[in-house]
Amino acid sequence: MSKDKLWGGRFTQPTDKFVEEFTASINFDKRLYHQDIRGSIAHATMLGKQGIIPIADVENIVSGLKAILEQIEAGKFDFSVSLEDIHMNIEARLSEKIGDAGKRLHTGRSRNDQVALDIRLYLRDELVEVSAYIDLLIDSIIHQAEENLGVIMPGFTHLQTAQPILFSHHMMAYHEMLKRDKARMEDCLKRTNVLPLGAGALAGTTFPIDREYVAELLDFAEVTRNSLDSVSDRDFAMEFCAASSILMVHLSRFSEELILWSTSEFKFVELSDSFCTGSSIMPQKKNPDVPELVRGKTGRVNGNLVALLTLMKSLPLAYNKDMQEDKEPLFDTIDTVKGCLKVFADMVREMKINPERMEVAAAAGFSTATDVADYLVRKGIPFRDAHEIVGKTVRYCIENEIDIPELSLAEWQLFSGRIEEDIFESITLEASVNARRATGGTALERVRAEIARAKEGR
């Protein structure tokens, strides 16, 4: 018999020392201690209510678990690799403290449904925190959009100047992305907030448990409906990691733009010194390490998603030891996403923009060429013909090393007799921006309305 194991009755030889270390998860699943104890208290309370164990035992179990919780939080609990995981560590310590009552705690329960409960409880709490961090970044974005309303910058396609837009409009694009990210987290919470406890190892339990009562004690919205699925389901973890990967892609795109915009070539923004570092050899350098790291950590979070998907892709029902590998990718994703959101929210709020530099860049690169085409359409010329006319005009400007605003009326009329004096008021940056008044456009009135709408939704 393997006497030091709670499951050792069937075994005649001790576990190999390296195998013990190789299979143990306590080094990373100990962060689930609070959820494990909370779940055990609810389970014990239900066992007592149902008359499955004596009320006196329930009282001893609850007081013992609370004492263990205090011991862990005080840093005085010695976790043992030989006890494999957080569940066995706590149960063994409980039995040591209160005797046989502690050994009755696991009645009607398996580690399979126990760990499924712990992860759901943990992720449920973390989803609320992640959503709160998303809100912090949204607040910073709205702050920048409101503070700099009216500043015009170039909008890009293919990283080439395309059309003038408001800087605030650009900021609010990230607001839209983050709104979707938050909605995905909220949707994930719905599917996470389901109680698996009571499924046993895979087939349920022979004891007259009350799962709905446990769900009520632990604030779950409902209970799972199939015991096999209950212990083998990690969809909620994969869904969170998928939502996190999309979120990190958004932060990575934002990071890329801030990195570009903060270069001496762009000079659109300046990041606070608090969020940059210097060079060990080049004294003039101010490196945007924070957005670069966020961009880099995106690959890490994406990798965690792939790890979970690959982990689960060929597992037969129900529980398999492979599933122990679900926690590290999940925990790392949670930690990484929260850290990135926190630092990004502070960095965005404190960054300074350079309106003059943005406006100069917005005026270059024939950015109002589309406005000329639209002008010609309003003069009765079909759009494809207008497009051709403006293309020839741009080529003329390139050959003569001038930009669209520098053309005289006589030069304009070389390309179309429909062009009149009013062309000049149609191709200013302000006119270009404010002409785009349809819902979702960059016109000042539209962007102001979207900022107000975003603030109302906070």
Swiss-Prot record:
InterPro entries: Arg_succ_lyase_C, Argininosuccinate_lyase, Fumarase/histidase_N, Fumarate_lyase_CS, Fumarate_lyase_fam, Fumarate_lyase_N, L-Aspartase-like. It catalyses: 2-(N(omega)-L-arginino)succinate = fumarate + L-arginine. It is an enzyme of class 4 (lyase). The keyword Lyase applies. GO terms for molecular function: argininosuccinate lyase activity. CDD domains: Argininosuccinate_lyase. Pathway: Amino-acid biosynthesis; L-arginine biosynthesis; L-arginine from L-ornithine and carbamoyl phosphate: step 3/3. One of its GO terms (biological process) is arginine biosynthetic process via ornithine. SUPFAM superfamilies: L-aspartase-like (SSF48557). Its main location: cytoplasm. It is found in: Cytoplasm. The keyword Lipid biosynthesis does not apply. Its EC number is 4.3.2.1. Keywords: Amino-acid biosynthesis, Arginine biosynthesis, Cytoplasm, Lyase. One of its GO terms (cellular component) is cytosol. Belongs to the lyase 1 family. Argininosuccinate lyase subfamily. This is Argininosuccinate lyase. It comes from Geobacter sp. (strain M21).
